[in-house]
Amino acid sequence: MAKRINFTSCLIFTSCFTAFIVSLCLLVSSCVNLVNDVIIPSVHMSRRADITPFIDNYTINFTDLHFFTDGANASVPQPEAIFINSNNFSLYAHNCSARDNCSVHSASITQEGRCYHYSRAKYSFAGCLEFCRSYSPCYYLINPQKHMTAVRQNINESDTYWVGIFKSPKNTWVDLDNSSVTGVHDLYEDSYCAYIGLYTEVPWPSFYCDTPRRCLCGGSKGI
């Protein structure tokens, strides 16, 4: 009888031990699968060359003002107020004689005495200031509100364009003529640069002025 009890006990112990080992293996396997399935978010660190389209004689050194770098030459965004408050945008206002006015040959579209040019490449807000000025003597990053309907009709569905509207140090929206601008869909308190798209009936604000977008340049049409 004792031998029978011992045999039964051993059988029960062996079964329990086997079940324990199997359960432990399943637990370890589940933990491994869980770790493999977890997606850990990462932060993309953009290098200077990814942001600044102009390297030589970059009057508004947007990258230096807007970013600080670590030892690996990576960059981290800082508030746009540093950029807006540290630059004189009047340098990029239009100031040209009648003979320098834009012509239909350099414009993408013309409207009531205005030329508009849509850039193909994408730049930061500061990059668009430089691009428009370098494209033609009397072109500048323009405020398109006077011709918003016509301008938007020529914008692709997937594209957005920087326009010449930004926050002044007084925290009001202005254009390159230093004229007060109303009608900006100001969703965010800490937004400093404006852009438009096919579906924006009014200019929209952007907190990150370094976002690559196309440029809307403009100027006065010559006679």
UniProtKB/Swiss-Prot annotation:
Domain C-type lectin, first and last residues per copy: 111-218
Alphabetically ordered keywords of this record: Disulfide bond, Lectin, Signal
GO molecular function ontology, one term from the record: carbohydrate binding
Disulfide bond annotation, renumbered to this chain: C193-C209
Top-level taxon in the UniProt lineage: Viruses
Cited InterPro entries: C-type_lectin-like (IPR001304), C-type_lectin-like/link_sf (IPR016186), CTDL_fold (IPR016187)
Signal peptide: 1-31
Gene3D superfamilies reported in the protein's UniProt record: Mannose-Binding Protein A, subunit A
Keyword Signal: yes
SUPFAM superfamilies the record matches: C-type lectin-like (SSF56436)
PROSITE patterns xref list: C_TYPE_LECTIN_2
Record has Repeat as a keyword: no
Record's protein name: Putative C-type lectin protein 51
Organism: Equine herpesvirus 2 (strain 86/87)
Source species taxonomy: Viruses, Duplodnaviria, Heunggongvirae, Peploviricota, Herviviricetes
Gene: 51
